[in-house]
Amino acid sequence: MDNTLIDPRIIGKHVYGNLYEIPEEIAGDEEYLRNVVVEAAKLANMTLLEVKSWKLGGEKGGVSVIALVLESHIAIHTWINYRYATVDVYTCGEKSDPWRAFNYIVEKLKPKEYTVNYADRTQLLKQ
């Protein structure tokens, strides 16, 4: 069997993580979080198509913001009482930088600590 180098046809980059001990006033501020996502998309050279957000009440209440970008998506989900957030940035193509978006979001949400994961989701086709 020939193991010739494979050709990446789709460049998929996925950066995601968990943010701990974020300020409650940030975790619950839907407008602020929307603005953070919009700016993160710009900084990462993404083409913003639409932003949706909503605030959920109750003990596990929080805010969700999802940006659809031409290259894929950015999502933030917060839990106010737990001072916790998850962040997901996925891009397709070579021109966008999901790391830049993720790092900007972390800077603006001000966690005391966070974890970050990366998955290369490039489709590799044998030649």
Swiss-Prot record:
One Gene Ontology term from the biological process aspect of the record: polyamine biosynthetic process
Keyword presence, Lyase: yes
GO cellular component: cytosol
Single GO term (MF): arginine decarboxylase activity
PANTHER family for the chain: S-ADENOSYLMETHIONINE DECARBOXYLASE PROENZYME
Active site positions: 72, 77, 92
Biological function: Specifically catalyzes the decarboxylation of L-arginine to agmatine. Has no S-adenosylmethionine decarboxylase (AdoMetDC) activity.
Name the record gives this protein: Arginine decarboxylase proenzyme
Modified residues (Pyruvic acid (Ser)): 72
Pfam families, per the entry: AdoMet_dc
Family: Belongs to the prokaryotic AdoMetDC family. Type 1 subfamily.
